[in-house]
Amino acid sequence: MNPYAELTHFAGFDWAKDHHDVIIVDVQGKIITGFRMDHTVEGWRTWREKTAAYPRLGVAIETSFGAAVEQLLESAVSVYPVNPASAKRYRERKCASGNKTDRHDAWALADALRLDGQAWRALQPQDPIVAELRILCRDEVALIEERTALVNQLQQALHEYYPAAEEAFDDWTQRSAWAFVERFPTAEALTRAGKRQWEKFLHTHKLNRPETFTRRMEIFARAGEWKVSAPMVAAKSFYAVAKCRQLRLLENELHAYRRRIEALFASHPDSSTFGSLPGAGPKLAPRLLGEIGSDRTLYEDAGGLQCMAGTAPVSYQSGQIHRVSLRHRCNKMLRQTIHHLARLSRAQCTWAANYYDALRERGKTDAQALRSLGQRWLKIIWKMWQTRTCYDPELHLKNQLAHGSWVLSFQPSTPPKKHAKNFSKKATCNG
């Protein structure tokens, strides 16, 4: 039985950072009560007291996560998340003039749940491991973005006063690059140290590969040719060293995040399913589990998962007008993860590489080809997820042959193009 059918009262919850507006209506749409509550312990005590008389209460709210949603789920009510774009339409339906108040917004949500909620899906209590994994992975990505910002700031400073240092290292996310700036913060310090100290530094940090060692030594030798004013050097070198120290601290925290994520992921029964995906590796597999979750009833078919990931296009048809466009309203984290998976899978799956290459030859852009490949992977992932099985390249090929998959038409007679510069070298599967 649909839990919605058991509801006797419907609440609209217009949430904000420090307070929330609530309207409760009955099955006829009559407003039973309305109140504003603070987002505090006392405020949530007020919520429980005022809603205790409505044991079968459904709540509509414009978000599916956050502190307010956690508190609502703890109070044992049915929570129905509403897309903000849909909520805006419901508000406009209730007030064509455009008049807007928080109380009106809460009422519009409550009445929308009363009238249309039979087609909505209530939030289910989350698997604790999945919930923590999702938050950790999203925060890890945020920290990586912070690291990228710090690296850009460091490189810009070096470009202004110390271009030799910027030129000497290609990857500024490496500790050896930061150590160089800390050891030789200025071109003058580098020149004064001399050749023997340069060689010692490179050997200590295992930067003595023949193809790069000679080039770096040449760069160090001409570092003093770039002339900059003394005040600029003094200020920017102080700034650059500060950025290196920030990067070092942040890198330590990223390593701690990685250990926690990998431990949580390994403890979940679905880890083998997502971990078996070609190209997923220790970073993408936990993100996939965190975003897709473990509730098998959430997506009735692969199409629902594809829409959530943003790989399924949006079609608009009216009269003789028909256009197809990119889906913007989706789970951005899941879309980014699938994009990376599609890119990395080409190095390990022949069919994925052939499929991508064929789409590029047909004129598709890199992003379009990867999105199409991600669409194919999501169909596979959904089936693996539903059946709790690992990716089997031989079974996949057998299914392609049995069903006459059109992907097989992309298989060339010659080996696929290699993309070694983008991927680590791993065994190729023939899926």
Regions found by a protein language model. Give the residues of each.
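A detector of single, family-specific signature residues
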Residues: 1-431
